[in-house]
Swiss-Prot record:
The keyword Protein biosynthesis does not apply. It is found in: Cytoplasm, Nucleoid. This is DNA-binding protein H-NS homolog. It comes from Buchnera aphidicola subsp. Acyrthosiphon pisum (strain APS) (Acyrthosiphon pisum symbiotic bacterium). InterPro entries: H-NS-like_N, H-NS_C_dom, H-NS_C_dom_sf, Histone_HNS, Histone_HNS_N. It comes from the Bacteria. The keyword Cytoplasm applies. Belongs to the histone-like protein H-NS family. Homodimer that oligomerizes on DNA into higher-order complexes that form bridges between disparate regions of DNA compacting it. Its main location: cytoplasm. A DNA-binding protein implicated in transcriptional repression and chromosome organization and compaction. Binds nucleation sites in AT-rich DNA and bridges them, forming higher-order nucleoprotein complexes and condensing the chromosome. A subset of genes are repressed by H-NS in association with other proteins. Keywords: Cytoplasm, DNA-binding, Repressor, Transcription, Transcription regulation.
Length: 135
C-alpha cells in the first residue's frame, strides 16, 4: 500500500490532518470522493452486467450445441488436441564452448545458463578470456 492510501485508511491520521484544513476544504474533498466512488460503482456495475451478458450468451450457445447433437465437452477436447499438436519442442542448442573440468574430462557449454566454474574462475583470475574456450 502506498503512503497516501495508508493515510486515507487510518482514522487517527485523518483526524490529525483534518485539523490543519478548513471545513470548506474538507467538504470539497468529500464531494470529490463521492464523485470518485460513484464513478467506481458505475464501472463495477458495468463489469457485472458484461459478465452476466456473457453468461447468458454461453448458456444460449451451449443449448444450441446440445440441440444440434454436439456435446460441449467433445468440442473442448477437439480444440485442445489441435493446440497440443501445434506445440513443438525447441531443438537443443549446440555447444559453443569447450573446457576441461576438474576430473580432466572434456565438457561443452552452450553459453546459456550458469557459467561453468572452470571457465568462470579462469576469467576471474585473468588467465583466459571467454573466446579462448570457443569450439
Amino acid at each position: 500500500m502506498n503512503e497516501i492510501l495508508k493515510i486515507l485508511n487510518n482514522i487517527r491520521t485523518l483526524r490529525v490532518h483534518s485539523r490543519e484544513c478548513s471545513l470548506e476544504i474538507l467538504e470539497e474533498i468529500l464531494e470529490k470522493f463521492k464523485v470518485v466512488i460513484n464513478e467506481r460503482k458505475k464501472e463495477e456495475k458495468k463489469i457485472k452486467e458484461e459478465i452476466a451478458q456473457r453468461a447468458i450468451k454461453l448458456k444460449k450457445y451451449r443449448e444450441m450445441l446440445i440441440a444440434d447433437g454436439i456435446n460441449p465437452n467433445e468440442l473442448l477436447t477437439k480444440t485442445n488436441s489441435i493446440k497440443s499438436s501445434e506445440k513443438r519442442k525447441r531443438p537443443k542448442r549446440p555447444a559453443k564452448y569447450k573446457y576441461i573440468n576438474k576430473n580432466g574430462d572434456f565438457k561443452t557449454w552452450t553459453g546459456q545458463g550458469r557459467t561453468p566454474s572452470v571457465i568462470k574462475n579462469a576469467i576471474l583470475e585473468r588467465k583466459k578470456i571467454l573466446e579462448d574456450f570457443l569450439l
